[in-house]
């Protein structure tokens, strides 16, 4: 069982991390051009591809249902608008790269909508993954990068093999893919506009609380 996580970047390129069923880091790639994904991804031999970006614009309004549902749990995320003209806005450039990533591999890994994730490309959000796996929002006073590394370590991923924050996010994406392959996942939202996959079969009845800062 293998899951490939992809962290999306604009000028820096994409970061890829491949995890196996034992959560070992099997391979990585840095600064990958989105146009090379269709050749590179099959070479990794993943059972699922987890991309840290939405697959398309919202169907209407200023955000997608999946993003609104995440915020109900206290997990803040960027909105994906429905207006394609927003593609010209510099802020949304990373989203358009994400759209391209989904399209680049859709022949081998079609976009996930419902059912099993095996052989699919799923949307993930590393921050949300870390919240769900830890059970808390990140504590104040601890950098997001350090917190996410700790979440990986607490779930048996050797974060020492990861050289950057982008690789950490790609590893969290891949870890989400492993949970999804094991059918331990939730995917709130509307499949027509994309659903963020979370690494838990059930979600809490109340919003997540913030973790207590570690003692100094």
Residue ranges: model-predicted function:
Residues 1-216:
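Phosphate- and other anionic-substrate recognition elements at nucleic-acid/protein interfaces
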């Amino acid at each position: 069982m293998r899951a490939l996580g992809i962290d999306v970047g604009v000028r820096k390129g994409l970061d890829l991390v491949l995890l196996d069923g034992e959560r070992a880091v099997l391979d990585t790639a840095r600064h990958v051009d989105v146009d090379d994904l269709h050749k590179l991804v099959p070479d990794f031999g993943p059972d699922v591809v987890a991309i840290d970006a939405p697959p398309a614009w919202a169907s209407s309004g200023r955000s997608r249902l999946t993003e609104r549902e995440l915020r109900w749990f206290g997990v803040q995320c960027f909105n994906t608008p429905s207006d394609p003209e927003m593609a010209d806005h510099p802020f949304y450039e990373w989203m358009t790269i994400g759209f391209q990533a989904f399209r680049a591999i859709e022949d081998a890994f079609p976009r996930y909508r419902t059912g099993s994730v095996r052989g699919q490309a799923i949307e993930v959000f590393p921050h949300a993954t870390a919240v769900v796996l830890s059970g808390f929002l990140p504590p104040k006073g601890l950098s997001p990068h350090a917190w996410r590394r700790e979440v990986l370590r607490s779930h048996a991923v050797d974060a020492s093999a990861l050289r950057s924050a982008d690789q950490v996010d790609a590893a969290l994406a891949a870890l989400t893919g492993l949970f999804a392959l094991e059918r331990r996942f939730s995917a709130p939202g509307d499949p027509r506009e994309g659903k963020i996959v979370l690494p838990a079969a059930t979600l809490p009845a109340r919003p997540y609380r913030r973790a207590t800062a570690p003692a100094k």
